[in-house]
């Protein structure tokens, strides 16, 4: 067996030991929430939604926080934006 395979095997065997505390209790996951989660969670806790924060009330989903449209008569369209495709507000 190569050295790399042997090290991977040892790490896989040690992995279950790393997830338990010394008394056998599982270590809880979660940890520190990301900035996006705390921002969204703070708005949900305060009863504010994105639609209430947008003056137009119209939003477009995208990766990460949503985008507020300028007016309520806008619509969302998937457009190419380097290097990905993104949702944009298209206002007539």
Swiss-Prot record:
Keyword annotations from UniProtKB, A to Z: Cleavage on pair of basic residues, Disulfide bond, Secreted, Signal, Toxin
Keyword Aminoacyl-tRNA synthetase attached: no
Q: Which residues form the signal peptide?
A: 1-20
Let me know which tissues express this protein, per UniProt. Answer: Expressed by the venom duct.
CC terms in the record's Gene Ontology section? extracellular region
PTM per Swiss-Prot/TrEMBL: Contains 4 disulfide bonds.
Compartments it resides in: Secreted
Per the UniProt entry, the propeptide covers 21-53
- Spans annotated as Disordered: 30-49
The answer to whether the entry has keyword Secreted is: yes
Kindly list the GO molecular function terms attached to this UniProt entry.
toxin activity
Free-text domain note: The cysteine framework is XV (C-C-CC-C-C-C-C).
Q: Which family does it belong to?
A: Belongs to the conotoxin N superfamily.
- Entry protein name: Conotoxin Mr15.2
Please report the organism this UniProt entry assigns to the protein: Conus marmoreus
Species lineage: Eukaryota, Metazoa, Spiralia, Lophotrochozoa, Mollusca
């Amino acid at each position: 067996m190569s050295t790399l395979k042997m090290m991977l095997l040892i790490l896989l065997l040690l992995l279950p030991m790393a997830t338990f505390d010394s008394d056998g209790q599982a270590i809880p996951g979660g940890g520190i929430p990301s900035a996006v989660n705390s921002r969204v969670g703070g708005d949900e806790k305060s009863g504010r939604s994105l639609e209430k924060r947008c003056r137009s009330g119209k939003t477009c989903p995208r990766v990460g926080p949503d985008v507020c449209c300028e007016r309520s008569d806008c619509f969302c369209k998937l457009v190419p934006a380097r290097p990905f495709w993104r949702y944009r507000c298209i206002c007539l």
